[in-house]
Amino acid sequence: MRLRSLTVWALPPALLAAATAIAMPLLALTPPLAPDQAMQPLAQVNAALQAGEADKALTLLKSLPSSDASQGEAHNLECRVRIMLSQWNAASDQCQEAVRLDGQNSEYHMWLGRALGEKADRASFLSAYSLAKRVRAEFEESVRLDPRNAPALADLGEFYRQAPGMVGGGIEKAQGVASELDKVDAARAHELRGQIADQQKDYSTAEREFKQAIAASAHPASQWISLASFYRRRQRWTEMETAVHSAETAAEHDKHAGLALYDGASILIETNRDPALASKMLEDYLAGSSKTEEAPAFVAHIRLARLRDRLGDAAAANRERAMALGLAHDYKPEQDSKH
C-alpha cells in the first residue's frame, strides 16, 4: 500500500493514552469506504485518459493504494494510458496484470489483445508469430465472456480478416463475426463486410457496405470517415474529400463524433489536402467535449503544430507543441507518423 508520509508529534504518555482511548471507538464506528467512493479516483483517471491528459492520469494512478480491490481496473487504465503513449511493452504488462486480477472481465481481455497486437506489429517475425496467436486468444476470450461486446467483436473480425491461417485467421471466420455483429451493431457489421470485400478486391460491394454502415449508424460521422478511407485507398480524391466534409457536417450535430473529426483531419494531412479544413477539424476536436483516448489530445496538438508550420505560423506551432508537452511529457512526436 502506498502511504503518504505522516508527521507524528511527541505527546506525553498520559495524554497519548487518553487520545488513543478516545480515538479507538471512533475508528471502530467509521464505516468502510462505499464501492462508489472507492471508484471515484478511477473515474478521475478515466476522465484524464479520455481528455488525453496522460501525465495527470499516471499521477493519479500512482496515488492509488496498491491493496485496493479495484486494482484490476487501475492496471487496465494504466495499460490504456501506455497505449496512448505508444509504450507497447509497458501497456502489455499492465493489461496482463489486469487480466490476472480479473480474468472474467471481457474489457480487460480486449485491451490486452489490442496492446499485444500493437506489440506484434513492431516485433520480429518469430516474435510476431507467437504474439499474434496470443492476440487471437485474447479477442476470442473477450467475446466468449461477453458475446455482445461490439468493439471486441469488431477487433476479432479484423484479426480474422487480416491474419494468415497459420495463426488462426481467415476470411470465413471474419464473415462469421460479421453475422454476430448483425445482432448487436449493424453499422460495425457493414464496416467489417466492407473491409472484407475491399481485401478481396470487390470494390463495388465494399463501397455499398460502407454506405450501408452510414445508413445504419446512429452516429454516422465515423462511418463517413470509413468511406473516406476507402476512397483514399482507391485514389478517388474528390469523393474522399466529399466524404470528409460529410463527416464534419455530421459531427456538428453529434456530441459523440470527436474521433471522426480527428480521423478526418488525419486523412487530409496524410494526403496533403485542404490543410485549412484539417486545422479546423483538429481545433473543433480539441475545443469540444468529445475527446477520447482513441484520438489523444496531445497528438492532435502535435499534428496541429505541423499544420501551423506549413501555413507559416511558427508562433502558433510552438504554442501547440507546448500544450502537447504539458499533457504528455514522455510522448515522442516522432512516434506519430501522421505528418
Identify what each model region corresponds to.
Residues 77-80, 111, 155, 192, ...:
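Canonical tetratricopeptide repeat
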Residues 46, 71, 80, 105, 114, 121, 149, 186, ...:
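Residue-level recognition of tetratricopeptide repeat
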Residues 67, 101, 145, 181-184, ...:
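Structural marker of alpha-solenoid helical repeat scaffolds
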Residues 63-64, 97-98, 141-142, 180-181, ...:
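Canonical positions in the second alpha-helix
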